[in-house]
Amino acid sequence: MVKVVATNKKAYTDYEILETYEAGIVLTGTEVKSLRNGSVNFKDSFCRFKNGELYLLNLHIPPYSHGGVYNHDPERPRKLLLHKRELKRLMGKVQEEGVTIVPLKIYFNDRGIAKVEIAVARGKKKYDKREAIKKREMERKIREYMKYSR
């Protein structure tokens, strides 16, 4: 049973999702406990390559309430764990103009291990967002009309 801790809803509105990957994440003990409490903030978080490794930046995991002196830095860069071939493929995709890697959700898998779903994404323009909203509204109105016309 997968337990989703948090979803990055803003990523779905601001980006066009091209491809998704599941990645492990290197966390300290207090970060895991804080995640199990369900507290995490995706605001402005993104992924970058550094020395051939992928890091998740600006992900805010607040300090654990019972952590004491050994608590973690809430904004520290966190290393993502992927297979070498996946890292090479991602590195190639990021070289393209306007393409970035964003986190979509954090969850605990069946074995209780924290995972991050990341996506290769392209930023949407303002008019693309408006079109998506119009399309969603029209579909909603059509469903509503069909529901009441029976």
UniProtKB/Swiss-Prot annotation:
Q: What is its main location?
A: cytoplasm
Cross-referenced InterPro entries? SmpB, SsrA-bd_prot, SsrA-bd_prot_CS
State one molecular function term (GO).
Answer: RNA binding
Q: Which UniProt keywords apply?
A: Cytoplasm, RNA-binding
Question: Could you tell me where this protein is found in the cell?
Answer: Cytoplasm
Domain of life per record? Bacteria
Pfam families given in the database record: SmpB
A Gene Ontology biological process in which this protein takes part is: trans-translation
Q: Which GO terms describe its cellular component?
A: cytosol
Function description = Required for rescue of stalled ribosomes mediated by trans-translation. Binds to transfer-messenger RNA (tmRNA), required for stable association of tmRNA with ribosomes. tmRNA and SmpB together mimic tRNA shape, replacing the anticodon stem-loop with SmpB. tmRNA is encoded by the ssrA gene; the 2 termini fold to resemble tRNA(Ala) and it encodes a 'tag peptide', a short internal open reading frame. During trans-translation Ala-aminoacylated tmRNA acts like a tRNA, entering the A-site of stalled ribosomes, displacing the stalled mRNA.
Q: Give the similarity note.
A: Belongs to the SmpB family.
What is the protein name stated in its UniProt record? SsrA-binding protein
Q: Which gene encodes it?
A: smpB
